[in-house]
Amino acid sequence: PHAGIGADVIVGFPGETDEHFAASANFIASQDISYLHVFTYSERNNTQALEIKPVIPISLRHERNKILRTLSFNKMQAFMESNAGAVRPVLFESVNKNGMMEGYSDNYIKIAAPFRKEWENSIVNWTI
């Protein structure tokens, strides 16, 4: 129940109708997915997809990408809230960004903390 589950989604593939996109967005919204990686379809030479019609206008592809990124943000916020107060192991990276360091919990919640040399590349128990 505490797993962070992500999904990769491509928007704007040739032939994607408004109805297809709405059905996909509604399906994703109904699932216990924690976050999305949203990709906008782009043409690639020497692929069969170049022959599929109709081609989705790039502006509509970007609009659909934004809609799903907003959905992803909202899902991640809800997931983080559902983990509030839980103690999770966090792997902190060694990067010092303006006195801060970042890491990810074992269920993919991004954590920012004041930089501490002794935490570099270490797993620290952290209250979410």
Predicted segment positions?
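Terminal RNA-binding accessory module
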Residues: 51-128
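Conserved C-terminal portion of the radical SAM core fold
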Residues: 1-47, 67-75
